[in-house]
A protein has these predicted regions:
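Fe(II)/2-oxoglutarate oxygenase catalytic core
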Residues: 2-259, 263-293
């Protein structure tokens, strides 16, 4: 099976469209190796016209590693596989949820820049998202190239240089990030299960060797720093990483499939008229194999 990749951002090795692969069909191991290499180069891969079911999505995803089990917040809608996270504004009766519905509020946290599962002790490697139903406008997924942002960061306005950040540890928490946008929606049981974790502020990709600032909305503070100083640094670095020149915005068409490397990018979902148009996305997540600390 031969395929080509069309760069989606002229002049950058970031975001590419894969042409010539049907992920529901048998794919030999050499093609998976080529896709791994392509993901290392582009960090985001787009596959158009992939009308797949959950079994097919899981089978394709498992070729890249073991899959995470979804959080309970991302179940429902008839999904029976724990490997599938359903991110949707549609309830179990196939009706559009109200804007104030608990799950709608929870999923609005995805509108903040983040790296999937950075709130877990061993964060995710790869995410694969299938657009089962998409709105006619809005609801784009934006991706920021954390590699290029790290390479080009000129240093902080507060006098902090890149070398000063080596070895620093940050606390990541999904409880913290969700409170930023929707308030306290977690039970005491959830808070016990989702305790904060420690992540390196700078991490090196184990396959490509490239470094990134490992941040996003789950990142709460820098260990050992004054809280206000650490929040200012996180805000400054995140603003730099998500400058327009580092960002690819994916406009979804029905049954698009998008794969990205969480070790190389931040991403977020854009809003849409969510009480008018349906948006149903199914995600599989390739588990990480080592902690960052």
């Amino acid at each position: 099976m031969e395929f080509t990749i069309k760069p989606l951002l002229p002049g950058m090795d970031f975001a590419g469209e894969v042409i010539g692969i049907d992920v529901a069909s048998p794919i030999n191991s050499s093609v998976y190796d080529q896709l791994r290499n392509a993901l290392g180069k582009y960090a985001v891969l787009v596959f158009r016209n992939q009308n797949i079911n959950d079994d097919q999505q899981i089978a394709f995803s498992e070729k890249f590693g073991s899959l995470e089990k979804s959080l309970g917040f991302d179940r429902g809608g008839g999904v029976t596989h724990p490997e599938i996270s359903r991110i949707a504004n549609v309830d179990d009766n196939n009706k559009i949820r109200s804007h104030g519905d608990e799950k709608s509020r929870y999923h609005r946290g995805n509108s903040l820049w983040h790296s999937d599962s950075s709130f877990k002790p061993i964060p995710a490697n790869i995410s694969i998202l299938s657009g089962r139903e998409v709105p006619p406008f809005g609801g784009e997924t934006e991706f920021a190239d954390a590699r290029y942002a790290y390479d080009t960061w000129p240093g902080s306005i507060s006098g902090v240089e890149k070398k000063d950040l080596e070895g620093l540890i940050c606390e990541h928490s999904i409880i913290f990030s969700r409170q930023l946008i929707v308030g306290d929606i977690f039970s005491e049981e959830d808070k016990e299960r989702l305790k904060p974790v420690r992540q390196a502020l700078i991490r090196r990709h184990p396959e490509t060797g490239r470094k990134v600032f490992y941040l996003g909305s789950h990142c709460h503070f820098v260990e050992g720093w004054d809280y206000s100083k650490s929040r200012a640094l996180i805000t400054e670095l995140t603003s730099w990483m998500t400058r327009p020149e580092f960002v690819y915005a994916h406009k979804w068409a029905p049954v698009d499939l998008v794969m990205w490397d969480n070790r190389s990018v931040l991403h977020r979902g854009n809003p849409w008229p969510d009480e008018e148009y349906r948006r149903v996305m199914h995600r599989t997540t390739v588990a990480g194999d080592q902690p960052t600390v």
